[in-house]
Amino acid sequence: MYQIGEALIGEGNEVAHIDLLIGDKNGPVGIAFANGMTQLSMGHTPLLAVVRPNLIPKPATLIVPKVTVKNMGQAAQIFGPAQAAVAKAVADAVEEGVVPKDLCEDVVIIVSVFIHPEAQDPTKIYKYNYGATKLALTRAMEKFPGVDKVTYEKDRGVHAIMGYKITRLWDAPYLQIAIDAPDLGVVERVLKNVPKNDHLIIEAGTPLIKRYGLSVISKIREIRKDAFIVADLKTLDTGNLEARMAADNLADAVVCSGLAPIATIEKFIEEARKVGIYSIIDTLNVENPAKLIAALKVKPDIVELHRGIDTESQSAEHAWGNIPEIKKAAGGKKLLVAVAGGVKVENVETALKGGADILVVGRSITNAKDIEGESRRFLQAMKKDEIDQYRIMTDF
């Protein structure tokens, strides 16, 4: 046996965070247990859990302090409420059948315990560590979480210390607001007025980047640190280099022109994948987007069907094309399709029914007197609830 469990319970300085291993005495957990008892580390001295002096729980449990113990007051918290809490949690877990009794002499447990240096309340330390240890042990025995649970939760939660969530594009449709005006004042005004929403993307447009460089991405990030930011470079050469530059400047996605050589596009996609950002192929002036995608050995994450600003005055039709055909050309890879040019509140439903995943809107929002109101009109037309808007949860 080699099982792993984790749990966080409580609040304030007494919060308990438990990392736990349970495994066979003659396996790696047993070896680690013996090493912990015989190879001591200053400030992190392992100790056996005891229900009370002279009474260890079964399975035998070793406590390892995560935070350096610097004085006798902190030592008393580990050798007092934390030690008792962990031991009692293990003993109760056996009594309740979480750990089968017939395993108790064959396995050992290692529990890594967090005690904040400013923790004060011994009752909270006990209660929180008891609950967290018992929960971590239960999760270890149940092999929680399963892969499906992790997949479901990974893009929903916010890490407590980080404090905000970096958006990934898994819950289409999305509204992408393109800021093309090469004016930092406009950028700031737009960013401060667009609503916070799980289905909103910010695009640093090509003219904006040409004036200020990719460092403008970092400026956008300063104002909206949790935003999903697209760098519209319209790369035509050195695809791998420009994709890496966008990632280094904190972009979440980067755009390559579909008019670039195939080799450039493929290097661009590979580099974007390597650095963990989305690759977007802009098909402005590409005659057959589906044919282009089919020709690529590696497929992008997003294809943008784009009618340019300069053709709007000519009453050109939008370039949305046959979206299902483009997705089919990806050969089974999950492909998002963005539509840009001619997107209005009135045709949002038509675009979505046609298969669009991302609606790119520029001046209709960025030039509006009521930026927030206009943004909300598009979001409402998309008829998409916020992620977990109606979910009431503790940890799950």
Swiss-Prot record:
- What pathway does the UniProt record associate with this protein? Carbohydrate biosynthesis; D-ribose 5-phosphate biosynthesis
Which region ranges are annotated with the description Formaldehyde-activating enzyme? 1-161
Keywords from UniProt, A to Z, are: Carbohydrate metabolism, Lyase, Multifunctional enzyme
Name the domain of life.
Archaea
Pfam families, per the entry:
Fae (PF08714), OMPdecase (PF00215)
Catalytic activity line of the entry: 5,6,7,8-tetrahydromethanopterin + formaldehyde = 5,10-methylenetetrahydromethanopterin + H2O; D-ribulose 5-phosphate + formaldehyde = D-arabino-hex-3-ulose 6-phosphate
**Region feature 3-hexulose-6-phosphate synthase, mapped onto this chain:** 162-396
Q: Which SMART domains match?
A: OMPdecase
The residues annotated as the active site are: H17
InterPro entries, alphabetized: Aldolase_TIM, Fae/Hps, HCHO-activating_enzyme, HCHO-activating_enzyme_sf, HPS/KGPDC, OMPdeCOase_dom, Ribosomal_Su5_D2-typ_SF, RibuloseP-bd_barrel
Q: Say what the protein does.
A: Catalyzes the condensation of formaldehyde with tetrahydromethanopterin (H(4)MPT) to 5,10-methylenetetrahydromethanopterin.
This chain belongs to the protein called: Bifunctional enzyme Fae/Hps
Native species:
Methanocella arvoryzae (strain DSM 22066 / NBRC 105507 / MRE50)
Q: What is the lineage of its organism?
A: Archaea, Methanobacteriati, Methanobacteriota, Stenosarchaea group, Methanomicrobia
